[in-house]
């Protein structure tokens, strides 16, 4: 099919004029003056891969596909790893019937037939192959042409449709934007049409079978060539990776310091077992005991050690089935070894080193028995989940067992950065409307079971699994369910429809499990398995590197369990480029845990979590990708909105994890240092208000007690100042710990010398009001009546009598100083890069109260009095606060809503009852002339009851385009004003705000 009509002789129509004006400005930004504000959508751009900056060629291609009316692609190479992350987007285009033409080539016979077949199966796509052998010419094009109405956007450069090219390789591409009459776009489209209509461009049915056969022969030859040097391949495999090298180095230091215990915390699939084997070899241990909790894991560990030691030491198994006690290296199950008769076969000091695999089990009694008996030179614990335990007893934790000596810690995100794991393509897919069983009646559970195992659900799972596919010659998948009866019924129905599945549970024998895994991991045969279905036994420990598809059919219990189950597919293996993860997302209240698990962000900041759902694919390291379909995305947003991240249970759990890791009560700075929950969640909790109050209520070891007034002062600083959004008050408090008089003068001098920051009269007045409880609204003034830090002294201020009395208490001073230092640290990291001459930082988030304070208002204003904006005459500042919550029918209602036109253009509506002559409207329109400073604050979700924060987007200037109108369904007028942002909104923030 030919989808793009020639229109080269057309003249510009009147409808094109707005596009032309916008395009001209964008071209000026790109080619003449980068400081010119223009629309990113019309701007030529350099397109490359850099996940740390939120940039991937893949994201650019996806964005254009989702926005276009039609597309054409010409690339030399297409692989499954390249099209898999695009499959969800391509499916959406098929539903919308967006036509596409894709031209590839048989150049070097590199394109994968399976990928070509997958593309051709999409009803909206026509695929052709350019035969370079017949044409007797090379073919190395890499171009992506997207058309929307009269505008072309074309990405052209170095990127084929392969995983490496689209996600992490150093790639150089240019995105050009042109009208359909532009010379460059016209030439590119003509070139594509010429190739597409050439006699050498073969239809799919013409080329596919012969190309597939030829590809198969050549691939076999390549595979044989790879096997020519087996020795060098094995040697390469046995070189320690970056994690293992770092771990051995640190372990040596721990030993040299005289410590006898150490813990390795490492993400599933990063090679913990090999790390321990390399460590035993490098540190020269002669007798080693390797403890596991399953026979199968003991066998796998022995196999890994055998590769590292190559027969230099004898190795044996001590399990229910094997009794090979007298070997140098023993691989034993805890169940067998902890029996008295087996334990006492060995002397206490028989082993130089004892390694405990899945060490989060070591708090159990069976392990305690072994830990109490043996006296090796080194105890080494290994786990991916140190915070997961077999008991809930206070004080019995893994960190404590290993003396809080962490030899190395590498979590999922770190492991992906280091390329230690197999890339994954995660797809969040809408499941049926199933409600979790927890708290349901038996009748409701029966009804739920019918849904879980319904024909509709079975067919949907099979359809999605087939569409999204796998890497390799055949599927080798794991399916996680929430119930054993569900697993059995699903297996029965899957098998009836042609899948080969088997259910494994805790009741199955080791032999049955081993046999099932062999059938799954092996090559195609009569008794091969496509999937093993499980509830929990594959969450940890079992190593099946060949797994190339993971299907999750259960609610996310916790980020820990999610990562464990995801991790089953993340081990690297021969002929496995990536693993496909299909997560069927129902209406579960814990859905918010999915982005927390994938991002590794444990701050529990709602807006950060929302942004990861929409933008995570841009920032995830390496070739991995993340996609959610529209409904599953909404379900996660709903779960985030409903969650209370300042809930005391969540706070206590995160606190306990950090305390366990450290072995003592954490300092405030430890929460940031170890990436635990943002301590501001503690301050936000209304029953707490401060870390001090939390410790008093929930930490038995904490014995400090302050007076009620002292406690209130600590709460005030925690809630109002400790976030570090401004340095002034924090450094003022720091001065009061040293000086009692001349506080403001000393503060001004210190800020000028250390921060190059000057305090004008408005700022000085605001800081004084803040520290004398005069800034607060009446309700807050009453709550914090004791929080008066300063008193007037001639031409300066000294500390107040009440506060001075508090400073006589050394315990109060210590808590105050820690809190102030924490706030200063936060300021330096997050809030020190001010926008122009303000106290604000672009793209940081601020509440109404923050804005009033940082704009140096004399008094705070309650949000109700501010509404969408408020003018402060004294400072001549005029902040605008916008709740950006786009509706589904946006095209019909934009003229009555605040909305972005481009990254540097905003349409905002005045308050109702306003006309062109209203004072606030005139102040907006004449702001520059009147010396009024208009600042823009925008928030995505006004229903977030916890943060209530707005992104700060800088200064705005009214363009002069304004019109008065009557608001729908009322007799009141309002004024629509167009604003220009001095700084166009950063791409990732803009996309997050404007997209649903």
Where are these regions (language model features)?
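Post-DEXD/H (motif II) to motif III coupling segment of the RecA-like Helicase ATP-binding lobe
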Residues: 361-425
């Amino acid at each position: 099919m030919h989808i793009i009509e020639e229109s080269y002789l057309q003249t510009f129509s009147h409808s094109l004029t707005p596009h032309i004006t916008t395009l001209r400005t964008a071209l000026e930004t790109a080619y003449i003056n980068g400081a010119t504000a223009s629309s990113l959508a019309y701007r030529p751009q350099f397109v490359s891969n850099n996940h740390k900056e939120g940039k991937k060629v893949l994201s650019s291609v996806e964005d254009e596909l989702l926005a276009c009316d039609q597309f054409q692609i010409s690339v030399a190479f297409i692989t499954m790893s390249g099209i898999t992350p695009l499959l969800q987007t391509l499916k959406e285009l098929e539903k919308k019937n967006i036509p596409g033409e894709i031209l590839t080539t048989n150049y070097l016979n590199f394109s994968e037939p399976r990928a070509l077949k997958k593309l051709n199966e999409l009803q909206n796509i026509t695929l052709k192959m350019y035969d370079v052998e017949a044409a007797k010419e090379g073919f190395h094009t890499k171009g992506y042409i997207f058309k929307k109405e009269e505008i072309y956007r074309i990405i052209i450069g170095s990127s084929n449709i392969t995983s490496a090219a689209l996600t992490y390789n150093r790639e150089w591409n240019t995105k050009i934007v042109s009208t359909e009459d532009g010379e460059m776009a016209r030439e590119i489209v003509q070139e594509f049409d010429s190739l597409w209509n050439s006699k050498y461009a073969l239809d799919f049915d013409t080329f596919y079978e012969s190309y597939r056969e030829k590809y198969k022969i050549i691939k076999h030859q390549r595979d044989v060539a790879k096997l020519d040097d087996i020795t060098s391949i094995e040697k390469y495999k046995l070189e320690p990776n970056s994690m293992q090298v770092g771990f051995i180095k640190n372990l040596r230091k721990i030993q040299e310091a005289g410590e006898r215990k150490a813990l390795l915390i490492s993400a599933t699939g990063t090679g913990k077992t090999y790390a321990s084997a390399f460590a035993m070899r490098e540190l020269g241990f002669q007798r080693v005991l390797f403890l596991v909790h399953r026979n199968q894991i003991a066998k796998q560990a022995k196999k890994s050690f055998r590769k590292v030691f190559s027969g230099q030491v004898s190795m044996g198994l001590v399990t229910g089935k094997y009794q090979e006690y007298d070997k140098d290296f023993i691989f034993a199950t805890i169940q067998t070894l902890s029996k008295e008769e087996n334990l006492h076969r060995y002397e206490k000091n028989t082993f130089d080193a004892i390694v405990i695999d899945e060490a989060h089990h070591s708090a159990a009694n069976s392990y305690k028995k072994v830990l109490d008996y043996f006296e090796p030179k080194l105890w080494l614990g290994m786990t991916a989940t140190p915070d997961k335990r077999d008991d809930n007893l206070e004080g019995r934790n893994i960190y404590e067992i290993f003396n809080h000596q962490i030899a190395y810690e590498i979590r999922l995100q770190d492991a992906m950065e280091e390329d230690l794991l197999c890339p994954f393509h995660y797809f969040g897919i809408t499941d049926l409307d199933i409600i979790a069983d927890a708290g349901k009646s038996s009748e409701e559970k029966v009804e739920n079971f019918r849904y879980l195992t319904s024909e509709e659900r079975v067919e949907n799972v099979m359809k999605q699994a087939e569409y999204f596919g796998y890497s390799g010659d055949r599927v080798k998948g794991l399916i996680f369910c929430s119930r054993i009866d569900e697993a059995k019924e699903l297996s029965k129905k899957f098998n009836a429809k042609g899948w080969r599945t088997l259910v494994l549970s805790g009741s199955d024998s080791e032999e049955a499990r081993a046999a099932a895994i062999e059938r799954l991991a092996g090559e195609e045969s009569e008794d091969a398995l496509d999937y093993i279905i499980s509830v929990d036994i594959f969450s940890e420990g079992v190593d099946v590197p060949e797994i190339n598809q993971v299907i999750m059919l259960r609610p996310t219990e916790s980020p820990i369990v999610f990562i464990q189950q995801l991790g089953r597919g993340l081990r690297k293996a021969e002929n496995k480029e990536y693993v496909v993860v299909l997560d069927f997302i129902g209406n579960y209240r814990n859905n918010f845990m999915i982005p927390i698990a994938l991002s590794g962000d444990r701050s529990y900041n709602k807006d950060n979590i929302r942004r990861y759902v929409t933008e995570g694919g841009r920032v995830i390291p390496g070739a991995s990708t993340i996609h959610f379909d529209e409904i599953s995305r909404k379900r996660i947003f709903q779960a985030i909105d409903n969650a209370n991240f300042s809930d005391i249970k969540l706070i206590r759990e995160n606190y306990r994890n950090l305390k366990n890791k450290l072995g003592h009560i954490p300092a405030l700075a430890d929460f940031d240092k170890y990436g635990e929950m943002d301590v501001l969640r503690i301050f936000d909790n209304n029953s707490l208000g401060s870390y001090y109050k939390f410790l008093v209520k929930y930490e038995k070891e904490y014995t400090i007690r302050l007076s009620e007034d002292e406690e209130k002062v600590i709460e005030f600083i925690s809630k109002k100042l400790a976030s570090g959004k401004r340095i002034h008050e924090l450094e003022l408090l720091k001065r009061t710990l040293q000086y009692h008089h001349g506080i403001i003068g000393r503060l001004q001098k210190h800020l000028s010398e250390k921060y190059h920051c000057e305090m004008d009269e408005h700022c000085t007045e605001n800081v004084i009001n803040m520290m004398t409880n005069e800034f607060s609204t009446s309700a807050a003034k009453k709550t914090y009546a004791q929080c008066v830090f300063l008193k007037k002294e001639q031409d300066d201020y000294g500390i107040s009598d009440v506060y001075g009395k508090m400073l006589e208490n050394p315990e109060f001073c210590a808590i105050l100083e820690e809190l102030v230092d924490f706030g200063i640290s936060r300021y330096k990291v997050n809030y020190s890069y001010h926008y122009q001459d303000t106290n604000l930082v672009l793209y940081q988030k601020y509440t109404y109260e923050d804005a009033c304070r940082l704009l140096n208002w004399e008094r705070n204003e309650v949000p109700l009095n501010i509404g969408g904006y408020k003018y402060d005459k004294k400072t001549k500042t005029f902040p605008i606060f916008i709740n950006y919550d786009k509706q589904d029918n946006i095209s019909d209602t934009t003229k009555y809503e605040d909305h972005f036109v481009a990254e540097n253009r905003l349409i905002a509506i005045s308050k109702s009852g306003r006309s062109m002559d209203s004072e606030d409207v005139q102040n907006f329109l004449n702001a520059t002339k009147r010396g009024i400073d208009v600042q823009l604050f925008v928030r995505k979700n006004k229903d977030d009851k916890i943060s209530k924060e707005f992104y700060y987007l800088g200064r705005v200037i009214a363009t002069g385009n304004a019109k008065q109108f009557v608001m729908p369904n009322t007799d009141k007028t309002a004024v629509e004003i167009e604003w220009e942002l001095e700084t166009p909104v950063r791409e990732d923030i803009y996309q997050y705000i404007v997209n649903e």
